[in-house]
Structures are given as C-alpha cells and as structure tokens.
C-alpha cells in the first residue's frame, strides 16, 4: 500500500477516533469530519483543512478501500476500513490511529490517550502491540512504526507511525540520547532527575564531612 499524505492520515485517523468516541454521530458527514480534523486539542500537528482538501483525501482513500461512503443517508457520510485495509489487530489499529492524530508518544502516553478508544490492561500490553507492529510491515513490506531515539530530559522513548513515510518525523528527531548530559539552561529537568541529582549532592557532602573529621579539620 502506498504512503498516506498528511491530509489522508488526518482524515482516516479522525474517522477512527469518532467511530469509537462518538458512535451515535458515526459515520461522519463531510462538515463534521472537517471539524474533527481541525480540532485544536488532541492533535499534533494542528491542521486547517478545507472541505475541498478533506474531500480530495476521502476520494483517494475510497480508491484504496480505506474509506467507504454510507449509502443509507441523504447527506453523504463516511466510515473507515482501516483495520481490514491494513490487516492489523484492533489494539494495533488503535495505536496507529493515535499516532496519526497526536504525533509521537511514549507507551505510557499511548495507554492514557487510548482510554476512550480501547482498554489496554497495562503499559506492557501497549509495548507488546508496538513491538508486533515494528516486527511486521504492511502488505508491501513497508515498516509501520518506529521507535525514536530517547532525547535528553525524557525517561521513555517515543514511538511514531511511518504510514506517511519518514520525512514527517524530522521535527521530532533530535541528536543525542537519554544518556547525554543535560544542559539545565536549554533542557528541562524532570522531577526524578532532580531528586537523583540532589541525592548525589547529599552523598558527596557526607563524604566531604567524613574526610574533614578524619583529618581533624573544621569546615568553614
């Protein structure tokens, strides 16, 4: 299957989201779909699709059998066929949908953000589904997800989808790893890191005090 464009990914993922979170309003009309695509919350990046752009994405997705038009309504309404189209399991489809909507996320973030979509038992089950996606590809053999390098200031590695290719990942990829030194003027320090630094400082102060005592010196 060919790579999706950003507009196609947003349209597809929005249909996936609304099917689970507002089933009474699903399938979606074009107007409702555009509003969902352009939400200011739970979207990364935020987009400003026009109805014409959304319709163009729908037309292409229909040709790939990833979107269908409901036939029981006077107003055209659309529904997705993602899980069958990509041949993935339900939890895998949920994770790919969230990654398309919200950008790269850690397993913990994915579990939290999936609450209204699907109930993962724990973070380990999220990690298992991601690992399965990483180990396989789509029907053309192309990779579907990638684990990004851990950046300074982050405890967990983030995951990203590859359904639109790798070029969209550039803003999220930074040089270095979580083991690199952190510059407090440019990188945020987490609470856990601050606690570990304070513990090391306290330990060093105790060692210095012990040395002064053994040498019979007094600290200024």
From Swiss-Prot:
Native species: Polaromonas naphthalenivorans (strain CJ2)
Protein's recorded name: UPF0502 protein Pnap_3223
Entries under InterPro entries matching the protein: DUF480, WH-like_DNA-bd_sf, WH_DNA-bd_sf
Gene3D superfamilies tied to this protein: Winged helix-like DNA-binding domain superfamily/Winged helix DNA-binding domain (1.10.10.10)
Pfam families: DUF480 (PF04337)
Disulphide bridges, residue numbers: none
Taxonomic classification: Bacteria, Pseudomonadati, Pseudomonadota, Betaproteobacteria, Burkholderiales
Family under the similarity heading: Belongs to the UPF0502 family.
PANTHER family named among the record's database cross-references: UPF0502 PROTEIN YCEH
HAMAP family: UPF0502
